[in-house]
Amino acid sequence: MDEFQRDGKKNRSWQQCFLYPLFFREDLYAIAHDHNLDRSSSSEPTEILNSNYFSFLTVKRLIRRIRQQNDSIVLFGICDPNQFIDRNRNSYSESVLEGLTVVLEVSFAMRSKHFLEGMDGWKSIRSIHSIFPLMEDKFPHSNYISDIRVPYSIHPEILVRTFRRWIRDAPFLDLLRSILHEWRNSFSAENLQKALVAPGENMRFPLFLWNSYIYECESFLVPLLKRFYTSRSLVYGSFPDRTDFDRKIKHIFTFPVKISTKRIWWMKDSFIHYVRYGERSLIALKGTHLQVKKCRYHLFHFWQCYFHLWSQSYRVSILELSRNYSYFLGFFIRFKMKSLVVRTKMIDSLLTTDLITNELNPIAPIRSILLFLAKERFCDISGRPISRLSWTSLSDDDILDRFDRIWINLFHYYSGSINKDSLYHIKYILLLSCAKTLACKHKSTIRLVREEPGSELFTKSFSKEREFIYSSFSKTRSQRERIWNSDILQINPLANSYTINK
């Protein structure tokens, strides 16, 4: 694949016309087959793994039968786990899917890299917490936020049309269409949500399809937003009231849109910032409520014309920063007006003025965390700690380590919230739940568990992370100082389990 990528950099025509022959390269399926064996080694018996040899000739026949569309339902359907033949056939079908994913990923990576090279100011950041400093810096200058849930009920033909824009290999597209129609159940809301939250073993192909679909949306949407800044003011002609007309029109510009016969009008002084993670996007705008409603209308029009998707109105909600809350990445996002007193000293006088700004206040959903802990049997519905009976068969070190990791992950993820002090109530619940679990295991009481010689580990376990993080901040900064961790790459599992009813 590395050699194939180097050849593609010299001549980009390969990714349009020569993808299908890659399916008949043995090294591609050797990697895919080894990956499947490593993934299934812990779940399948040894005798099946030893007898499940790999034949490249079978893969070639399988690809031809898929293109003929006479065996794809059996090959990519649900196989009987009790039959060895179905297991063997399922292994080959997974190898074909792995090979298809590898070919698409390499081609997609080169195309996206070529696209990003021409996007000035466009940054793709892996860390989740890096989004919040951007919001603190840019969003307070806006007064409205469009909270968007990207449509994910994707029809296979829409994906085929999307790939057809940058792939010209007809046999490859025929093979891709056959596989997509048999995998159409993987594009349901439930499966895509699982793939986005916690990518599993068999979610690599659906996750790639989702990323390519989002990339295609943003490849049209982001340049459209950029033109709001680069477009020139509207040219006016000779009018009798030219002065008044100039005063009205000098802050307005227009640009043509290919998908519509109308022209979209925007305020030239408006601020537009775009942030996305997973299926949630935020567009911050500065303007009137009417302009924001027009933005939502054109967004619906964009999805319908480019991707033939009918998006419901509830998927794009308009929030006023000074009044509404927004739920994003496990936080309640609120902007609070903050007044700053500015004093300017002149030669003969001292001027004092108030500067009013918006301040980002991310709030940790403590109530939702308590409900999740109650669901997982760490406490009851009122927040009273209870013992975790399913962990009593573990060793003391394993029990302490599990409770410790839960608290560390929570504390790291919500270290930037303004209600950080409320997190120590969660720590208290986990602390007592851990003590009750150890007491239940040893048939003792909480007091005896804490007074045992080994209780020092229990005492230090939940406090070491806070002491480590705040050692350099406790003397010079306030305890309410927000800390964003740049090494967090995934949403906390607790944040994904919350059900927010808007």
From Swiss-Prot:
<keyword id="KW-0819">tRNA processing</keyword>
<keyword id="KW-0507">mRNA processing</keyword>
<dbReference type="InterPro" id="IPR024942">
    <property type="entry name" value="Maturase_MatK_N"/>
</dbReference>
<dbReference type="InterPro" id="IPR002866">
    <property type="entry name" value="Maturase_MatK"/>
</dbReference>
<keyword id="KW-0150">Chloroplast</keyword>
<comment type="similarity">
    <text>Belongs to the intron maturase 2 family. MatK subfamily.</text>
</comment>
<protein>
    <recommendedName>
        <fullName>Maturase K</fullName>
    </recommendedName>
</protein>
<dbReference type="InterPro" id="IPR024937">
    <property type="entry name" value="Domain_X"/>
</dbReference>
<dbReference type="GO" id="GO:0006397">
    <property type="term" value="P:mRNA processing"/>
</dbReference>
<dbReference type="GO" id="GO:0008380">
    <property type="term" value="P:RNA splicing"/>
</dbReference>
<keyword id="KW-0934">Plastid</keyword>
<dbReference type="GO" id="GO:0008033">
    <property type="term" value="P:tRNA processing"/>
</dbReference>
<dbReference type="GO" id="GO:0009507">
    <property type="term" value="C:chloroplast"/>
</dbReference>
<comment type="function">
    <text>Usually encoded in the trnK tRNA gene intron. Probably assists in splicing its own and other chloroplast group II introns.</text>
</comment>
<dbReference type="GO" id="GO:0003723">
    <property type="term" value="F:RNA binding"/>
</dbReference>
<dbReference type="Pfam" id="PF01824">
    <property type="entry name" value="MatK_N"/>
</dbReference>
<dbReference type="Pfam" id="PF01348">
    <property type="entry name" value="Intron_maturas2"/>
</dbReference>
<keyword id="KW-0694">RNA-binding</keyword>
